[in-house]
């Protein structure tokens, strides 16, 4: 694994050359990344089709479009973000210059995820490059076709010493984590997030951890159930449920459970036809291990829709479970698959209590026509982010930082927040060497008596 040490050393030496300090250089590299994407859309969608069964349109909409938007925003706004930020002066510093200067951290490690292997690897990179860092990318080996593609394309378009790709599995990642970085960005499971954080602690390296959890979705009786169920079905079953901010389960009053089931079924038919297996818009589970895990969560449950599978193609039908026991296995772990449990609660207060008795999720969703219900849900729970009357879309807005809290992660990125995450905000005070008389009082010897105010 000596090559990994050599790779990190190469990135460090390139960073130390100082070339990334130039704003013009950073923008040139971001524009090169833009070209890389636009000139290789077919290859990107092909890799996503091989890894996750996505079609060309889905690949672009779910993965590529948000990265291109992030690049557009960053290239346009970077000169303003990088400006020194003046701060308020005290009585003693009226003649001084006080400001915060954003400087690059150094060498950043980005460990990508397999479920959105393009977006969740490249989007963090945008912020790291914008902030002036060298970047080492570690794509997930689980989505191997995308890992191969990124390793091929990035050196063709970007500086070959500053922006490097390391392929491989657990051994390579383990060796990478022994190296000293200036920031580590990891997207994935909470269990591995703890390993990353422990490794980073040995070097006092700061981390951004975008993890997961069971993101709840509360459906109030006072809402348009047709619209609510259509939006929930879209967010839950896109990418075959393999989305870190997908609604994991529904909380609702028992009186509307059957209506929700029927309206979800209608939406699924509208989206994927009578047989989702034949739909070009419905994905597949990433590998056999995850297929067996998700399939096992359906066992001994009351299936209201779906529940079928085909192991040969790693297909699991869109599945709805009703009257789910909160203690059952499907409610003990993040599902990360096309299985939607419905848990009945008899009030908003009971729903809030249910959510607060569990780990803080990455996202929380609430559907209601009543603004007081929405405000109460937000005020009395905690999650990485919230969307009311829709799902997932809060993470697509560049001006809203995306990140977790507690077990669902720490730190955030997207838009300006990415630039800030990968920058050191350096406090600066510049004083004149003149007017020394005004500073006499601070020097020894001190007076025998305290001055009166």
Curated annotation (Swiss-Prot):
The active site is at residues 210, 244. CDD domains: ALDH_F3AB. GO terms for biological process: aldehyde metabolic process; lipid metabolic process; positive regulation of cell population proliferation; response to cAMP; response to glucocorticoid; response to hypoxia; response to nutrient; response to xenobiotic stimulus. Its main location: cytoplasm. Belongs to the aldehyde dehydrogenase family. The keyword Oxidoreductase applies. PROSITE patterns: ALDEHYDE_DEHYDR_CYS (PS00070), ALDEHYDE_DEHYDR_GLU (PS00687). It catalyses: an aldehyde + NAD(+) + H2O = a carboxylate + NADH + 2 H(+); octanal + NAD(+) + H2O = octanoate + NADH + 2 H(+). Its EC number is 1.2.1.5. The modification N6-acetyllysine is found at residues 178, 194. The keyword Acetylation applies. This is Aldehyde dehydrogenase, dimeric NADP-preferring. ALDHs play a major role in the detoxification of alcohol-derived acetaldehyde. They are involved in the metabolism of corticosteroids, biogenic amines, neurotransmitters, and lipid peroxidation. Oxidizes medium and long chain aldehydes into non-toxic fatty acids. Preferentially oxidizes aromatic aldehyde substrates. Comprises about 50 percent of corneal epithelial soluble proteins. May play a role in preventing corneal damage caused by ultraviolet light.
């Amino acid at each position: 694994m000596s090559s990994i040490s050599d790779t990190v050393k190469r990135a460090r030496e390139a960073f130390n050359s100082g070339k990334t300090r130039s704003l013009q250089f950073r923008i040139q590299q971001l524009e090169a990344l833009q070209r890389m994407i636009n000139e290789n859309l077919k290859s990107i969608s092909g890799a996503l089709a091989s890894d996750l069964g996505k079609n060309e349109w889905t690949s672009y909409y779910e993965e590529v479009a948000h990265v291109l938007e992030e690049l557009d925003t960053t290239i346009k706004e970077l000169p303003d973000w990088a400006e020194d930020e003046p701060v308020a002066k005290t009585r003693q510093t009226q003649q001084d210059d006080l400001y915060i200067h954003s400087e690059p951290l150094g060498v950043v490690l980005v460990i990508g995820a397999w479920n959105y292997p393009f977006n969740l690897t490249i989007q963090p990179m945008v912020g790291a490059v914008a902030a002036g860092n060298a970047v080492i990318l570690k794509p997930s080996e689980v989505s191997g076709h995308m890992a191969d593609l990124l390793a091929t394309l990035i050196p063709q378009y970007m500086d070959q010493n500053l922006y490097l790709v390391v392929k491989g599995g657990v051994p390579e990642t383990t060796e990478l984590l022994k190296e000293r970085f200036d920031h580590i960005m990891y997207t994935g499971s909470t269990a591995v997030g703890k390993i990353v954080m422990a490794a980073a602690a040995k070097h006092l390296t700061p981390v951004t951890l975008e993890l997961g959890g069971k993101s709840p979705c509360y459906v109030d009786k006072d809402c348009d159930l047709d619209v609510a169920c259509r939006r929930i079905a879209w967010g839950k079953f896109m990418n075959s449920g393999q989305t870190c901010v997908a609604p994991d389960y529904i909380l609702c009053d028992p009186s509307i459970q059957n209506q929700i089931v029927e309206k979800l079924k209608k939406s699924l038919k509208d989206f994927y036809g009578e047989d989702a297996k034949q739909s070009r818009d419905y994905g597949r589970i990433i590998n056999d291990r995850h297929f067996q895990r998700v399939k096992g969560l359906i066992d001994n449950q009351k299936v209201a829709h779906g529940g079928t599978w085909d192991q040969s193609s790693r297909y699991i039908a869109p599945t709805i479970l009703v009257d789910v026991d909160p203690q059952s296995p499907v409610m003990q772990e993040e599902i990360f698959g096309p299985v939607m449990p419905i848990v009945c609660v008899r009030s908003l207060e009971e729903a809030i209590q249910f959510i607060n008795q569990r780990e803080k999720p990455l996202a929380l969703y609430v559907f209601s026509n009543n603004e007081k219900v929405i405000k109460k849900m937000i005020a009395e729970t905690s999650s990485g982010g919230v969307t009311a009357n829709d799902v997932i879309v809060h993470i697509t807005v560049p001006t809203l930082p995306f990140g977790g809290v507690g077990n669902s992660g720490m730190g955030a990125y997207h838009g300006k927040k990415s630039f800030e995450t990968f920058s050191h905000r350096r406090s600066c005070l510049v004083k004149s060497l003149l007017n020394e008389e005004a500073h006499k009082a601070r020097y020894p010897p001190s007076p025998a008596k305290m001055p009166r105010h």
